[in-house]
Amino acid sequence: MLRQLKLTLNISRWIFMPWQRHASASSSQVPPFLAPISDDVIVDYEDPDYLPLPEYPVRPNEPLETRKQRLLYQSRKRGMLENDLLLSTFAAKYLKDFSAEQTAIYDQLINGVSNDWDIYYWATEVKPTPEEYNTEIMKLLKEHVKNAERVTRFRQPDLT
């Protein structure tokens, strides 16, 4: 009976904990996905050269109000919660007062970058901003992210 229980435990360990298949009973091997991650580590891989980056279509004849409405929508629907909160609150606060040139710069910022994590790391100043994106709008976004007014941003602002 004891032998049968031991065999069952070994088989279940082999099935449900595959990282311990070759580990001895005394070792405390931790699977890579359960290993602790320190706060100062950024997991960021360079894009391979063979990966084509999509080009964002230029819309030269788009009216300014239509562009602002599109950018407001795109600021809210980024695909990652961090940027959804940062960019939607930024757009709600500043986008309505942007000139045509500032709106074009903001459009290039949020749609010209192929990786949303880059925008997040630049805005939070974890990584340096490339020169082409280090504009007045990015500086304004960085100030917005610092949140000097200590505004609570648990949700996106209401659409008006």
From Swiss-Prot:
This is Succinate dehydrogenase assembly factor 2-B, mitochondrial. Residues 1-23 form a transit peptide. Its main location: mitochondrion. Keywords: Chaperone, Mitochondrion, Transit peptide. It comes from the Eukaryota. Plays an essential role in the assembly of succinate dehydrogenase (SDH), an enzyme complex (also referred to as respiratory complex II) that is a component of both the tricarboxylic acid (TCA) cycle and the mitochondrial electron transport chain, and which couples the oxidation of succinate to fumarate with the reduction of ubiquinone (coenzyme Q) to ubiquinol. Required for flavinylation (covalent attachment of FAD) of the flavoprotein subunit of the SDH catalytic dimer. It is found in: Mitochondrion matrix. Belongs to the SDHAF2 family. Transmembrane segments: none annotated. It comes from Drosophila pseudoobscura pseudoobscura (Fruit fly). GO terms for biological process: mitochondrial electron transport, succinate to ubiquinone; mitochondrial respiratory chain complex II assembly; protein-FAD linkage; tricarboxylic acid cycle. Interacts with the flavoprotein subunit within the SDH catalytic dimer. GO terms for cellular component: mitochondrial matrix; mitochondrion.
